[in-house]
Amino acid sequence: LGAVKVNNKIMTELGYRVKPNDVVHFDGQKLQAEKPAYVLLNKPKGFITTTRDEKGRRTVMDLVANATTSRIVPVGRLDRPTTGLLLFTNDGDLAKKLTHPSTGVKKLYHVVLDKTVSGQHLQRIKSGITLDDGAIKADEISFVQGASKREVGIALHSGRNRIVRRIFEHLGYEVVSLDRVLFAGLTKKDLPRGHWRHLSQSEVQQLK
């Protein structure tokens, strides 16, 4: 096995975590650390949230292919028909923090349904309903201002699979469209559908 040196000292400690300013050599060659990358995408319909798809379907990675040379991965997921904000990074610690249930990252969705939503059902979602995988309740829910009663804004911190769709399906509605408009304080402002941008330093600090 080749010798690993950190800051010119042979590394014998297992599990040592390399720090951003460490200089690492392997077999005499200096290793270049990847720069941290944080990319925000406004995902369109029809793309799968995965790093590769064996069936050859379009993935979100196709949309951010030119964003960075770093090996970024999506933080969480949006299903194929869902649109809106999806974050990518190579910062494993931040990705873990943002997806861990205890962190309680706020996500806001704009939901369009196949029929008018009753006020009683809004109240039930706010109070809590029980799905196959346990209880769930919205942090906030209301009709979208100036829109029809088929359009609802719902805020959740749950990361459970298809949770928004399942909430409304449980109450007899069909979700016509689902758009994530806020994720962990990040919004879609000045970010058209299908486009991406790099996070600012202050946005990264806010997430950490």
Feature roles, as predicted:
Residues 1-208:
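Basic, flexible Lys/Arg- and Gly-enriched helix-loop patches that mediate nucleic-acid binding at interfaces
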